[in-house]
């Protein structure tokens, strides 16, 4: 892992392009809709004044500087977990400080996933709507929004369809395309800004404060909801830390920020130059980004912005896979199938998540129909994620011995700033923001049910000392009157204690049908706070037939239990801890490892369980959700192994028994 980490930290032309293609898709496409959202929200071009434009530019500049540059690039990026970033990586760094920190992690993760469903719809629709300005398009289709919707649906459907095959090949063009995109943004901005350099006065925070109280600002304080769209990609920047490394972000962000600001300033210059152009008054969804292009450049502008939007969408889709995968490993989300279409680091494909994202994006496009309506709903959930990150970051700063006053200043300053954006975005709730809130609440509910159900079950399960059954297992092992069930009989246990397992496991071995084996394996898998841990410990209890294994795997490690267990068996045989398992019949010469049989216990809630009504509902809901998750066999990489599934009643809480009384006639 150290080699892998050092390789992504290297600064090369390739790493520079990869960073552009992976990290900045979301924030890099914000010029498509930020100015458009603010101008149209304030009443259109006819309501714009120079002071208003200076104030808007100042707000954008200082929002990007304070939130993206200072909070995320300079402070939060240092909170990496062995090179990995993101809200769940941050949570793993601090979760031992307080149990309640799981709440901001779950809330922030849910909101980030909800944002991932809106972003592809917003960016692709905003770019395709640029076609309306093309004379040739207008001549054929007029102002027909249905055509735009059809094109957007086709692009999004194609994007989700190709996920199954992996994006390694097309991913190679992401960096060069985004380089062209940012260069295009900068050049377009410079051309329009020339002759209007007085707009650079907007770098003073004076104008940002002044506009909030200006009568020219018809939105008042709520203008911050539109301004916030310029920095929504900051959280994604932190999440992608593990893909490109901190040094590459330090190198590329200043260049990206300059390109973005040049474009915003260029749009502002165009707006002021056209504010008396009555032909543009009343234009629905006026977009300065496309309007400021000369007619001969429009087609290229639409094409390159569409490609940038697709790349941004791909980054959000891949980020969603990674986010869910981390949540699963932390036991915050139901187990879903993970596929690896290529050998590239971070190339995960989750069919269930892909289908959900596709359906959600299509539904969002069909419901909102235009980027204007989507922008009105966009950004609300990501403010919640940023607030939750600030809470976790505060605890991380305390963990690394940052003086309490400094940590408090950081929390209060950025927390207040983000809370202001949250309040200003709250007006979006009735305009469509409720969609992202509902999505986030649905995801949060699933997380809550899953983790709460786990805690309820773990608190009530009956654990027993393995050594109490040492003699019985030895007798069963040597009982030649019984047919051998397996050479290696393997059970999965949730007990992290080296000498204990669940009673139901021993019940399966001894009571249900005595299972004779040479070696009984009890395997416990622990997901560590570090991303790429791969360690194990064993306890043989002084025997050669009874082994408790504890696998410690990082939260990004694929849990290939079959592969790991064979490696452990070979090492124990070589060390003399267990006997050589010679096979009389085999196609492999010198094979000294016997066969394996895995017993997977399927829990069914017993009618005898007597739980509090709320806990009972949680357990039933979790078992219902479990029906739609990937099977333990697939999750632990046992598809090609010999497995047997046993149904065991899950009896939780107190039980009530009715005693039958025999009646004699």
From Swiss-Prot:
Its main location: membrane. InterPro entries: K+_transporter, K_trans_C, K_trans_N, Kup. Pfam families: K_trans, K_trans_C. GO terms for molecular function: potassium ion transmembrane transporter activity; symporter activity. GO terms for cellular component: plasma membrane. Transport of potassium into the cell. Likely operates as a K(+):H(+) symporter. This is Probable potassium transport system protein Kup. The lineage of its organism: Bacteria, Bacillati, Bacillota, Clostridia, Eubacteriales.
């Amino acid at each position: 892992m150290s080699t892998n980490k050092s390789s992504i930290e290297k600064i090369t032309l390739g790493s520079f392009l990869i960073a552009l293609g992976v990290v900045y898709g979301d924030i890099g496409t914000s010029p498509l809709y930020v100015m458009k959202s603010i101008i149209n929200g304030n009443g259109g071009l006819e309501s714009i004044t120079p002071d208003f434009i200076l104030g808007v530019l100042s707000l954008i500049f200082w929002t990007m500087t304070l939130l993206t540059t200072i909070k995320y690039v300079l402070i939060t990026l240092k909170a990496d977990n062995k090179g990995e970033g993101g809200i769940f990586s941050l949570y793993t760094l601090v979760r031992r400080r307080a149990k309640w920190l799981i709440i901001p992690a779950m809330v922030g993760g849910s909101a980030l996933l909800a944002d991932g469903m809106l972003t592809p719809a917003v960016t692709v629709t905003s770019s395709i709507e640029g076609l309306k300005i093309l004379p040739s398009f207008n001549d054929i289709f007029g102002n027909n929004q249905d055509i735009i919707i059809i094109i957007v649906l086709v692009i999004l459907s194609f994007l989700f369809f190709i996920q199954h095959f992996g994006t390694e090949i097309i991913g190679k063009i992401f960096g060069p395309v985004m380089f062209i995109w940012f260069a295009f943004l900068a050049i377009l901005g410079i051309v329009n800004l020339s002759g209007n350099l007085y707009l650079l006065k907007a770098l003073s925070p004076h104008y940002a404060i002044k506009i909030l109280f200006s009568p020219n600002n018809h939105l008042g304080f709520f203008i911050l909801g539109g301004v916030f769209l310029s920095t929504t990609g900051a959280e994604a920047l932190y999440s992608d830390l593990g893909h490109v490394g901190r040094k590459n972000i330090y190198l590329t962000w200043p260049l990206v920020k300059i390109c973005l600001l040049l474009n915003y300033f260029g749009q502002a210059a165009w707006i002021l130059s056209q504010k008396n152009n009555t032909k543009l008054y009343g234009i629905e969804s006026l977009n300065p980004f496309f309007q400021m292009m000369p007619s001969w450049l429009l087609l290229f502008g639409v094409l390159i912005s569409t490609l940038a939007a697709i790349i941004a969408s791909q980054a959000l889709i891949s980020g969603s896979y990674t986010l869910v995968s981390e949540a699963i490993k932390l036991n915050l989300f139901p187990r879903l199938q993970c596929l690896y279409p290529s050998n590239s680091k971070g190339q995960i494909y989750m069919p269930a998540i892909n289908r959900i994202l596709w359906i959600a994006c299509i539904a969002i496009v069909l419901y909102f129909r235009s980027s204007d309506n989507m922008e009105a709903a966009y950004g609300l959930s990501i403010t919640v994620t940023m607030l939750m990150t600030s809470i976790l970051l505060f605890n991380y700063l305390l963990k690394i011995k940052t003086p309490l006053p400094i940590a408090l200043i950081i929390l209060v300053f950025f927390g207040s700033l983000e809370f202001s954006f949250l309040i200003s975005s709250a007006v979006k709730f009735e305009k469509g923001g409720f969609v992202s809130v509902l999505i986030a609440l649905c995801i949060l509910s699933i997380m809550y049910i899953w983790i709460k159900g786990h805690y309820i079950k773990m608190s009530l399960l009956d654990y027993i000392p393995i050594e109490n059954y040492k003699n019985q297992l030895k007798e069963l092992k040597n009982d030649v009157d019984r047919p051998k069930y397996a050479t290696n009989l393997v059970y999965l246990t949730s007990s992290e204690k080296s000498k204990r397992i669940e009673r139901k496991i021993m019940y399966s071995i001894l009571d249900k049908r005595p299972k004779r084996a040479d070696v009984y394996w009890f395997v416990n898998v622990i997901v560590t706070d570090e991303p790429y841990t791969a360690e194990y410990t064993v306890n043989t209890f002084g025997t050669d037939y009874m082994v408790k294994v504890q696998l410690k795997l990082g939260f990004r490690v694929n849990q290939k239990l079959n592969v790991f267990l064979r490696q452990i068996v070979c090492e124990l045989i070589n060390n003399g801890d267990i006997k050589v398992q010679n096979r009389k019949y085999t196609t492999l010469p010198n094979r000294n490892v016997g066969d394996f049989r895995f017993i997977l216990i399927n829990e069914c809630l017993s009618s005898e369980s007597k739980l509090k009504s709320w806990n009972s509902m949680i357990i039933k809901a979790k078992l219902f959700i479990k029906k739609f998750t990937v099977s333990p066999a697939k999750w632990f990489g046992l598809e090609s192994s010999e497995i047997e599934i046993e149904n065991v009643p899950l009896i939780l809480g107190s039980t009530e028994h009715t005693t039958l009384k025999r009646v004699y006639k």
